[in-house]
């Protein structure tokens, strides 16, 4: 695998782990720190490069990372959308919805950027933050000729997979 792909996966996976294990519902979550905390786990000669890439994502507007079909710019687009989307004071978990919409609005490889952002946002805010209307629209495909899997079934499968 390309070193950038490995580094991006390590950084994002560790940020997801941190969101799951440390994020408190009523406290601010430091998205940037969660991603930067993984720098010590990537190959040493890539750390400075990725530190700079994270800085670009944190300081640059989401639209700066288009086109984003490459792992680095997709990573930056997802992080930028998350960080640059305000967390609503009244309903903080609406940040998941708002940041995903921001990620998609960047354009280009929208499904990839939204999937990357959604993994970290979901880890932080939980399945309950997914808007009900989105769950009714989501469908998957079964392996053989049969009816599509509904959003509700996908949610049940996910909950069973994590033992919830």
PLM features: what roles do these ranges have?
Residues 1, 11-17, 73, 77-164:
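Catalytic phosphate/nucleotide-handling subdomain of diverse soluble enzymes
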Residues 1-88, 99-103, 120, 124:
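Amphipathic alpha-helical interface segments
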């Amino acid at each position: 695998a390309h070193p950038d792909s490995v580094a991006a996966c390590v950084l994002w996976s560790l940020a997801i782990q941190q969101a799951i294990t440390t994020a408190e519902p009523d406290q601010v979550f430091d998205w940037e720190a969660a991603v930067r905390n993984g720098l010590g786990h990537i190959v040493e000669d890539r750390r400075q490069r990725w530190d700079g890439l994270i800085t670009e994502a944190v300081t640059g507007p989401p639209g700066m990372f288009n086109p984003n079909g490459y792992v680095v710019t997709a990573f930056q687009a997802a992080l930028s959308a998350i960080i640059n989307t305000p967390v609503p004071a009244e309903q903080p978990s609406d940040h998941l919805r708002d940041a995903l919409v921001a990620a998609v609005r960047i354009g280009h490889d929208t499904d990839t950027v939204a999937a990357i952002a959604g993994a970290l946002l979901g880890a932080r805010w939980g399945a309950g933050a997914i808007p009900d209307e989105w769950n009714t629209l989501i469908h998957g495909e079964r392996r053989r000729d049969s009816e599509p899997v509904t959003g509700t079934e996908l949610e049940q499968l996910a909950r069973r997979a994590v033992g919830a």
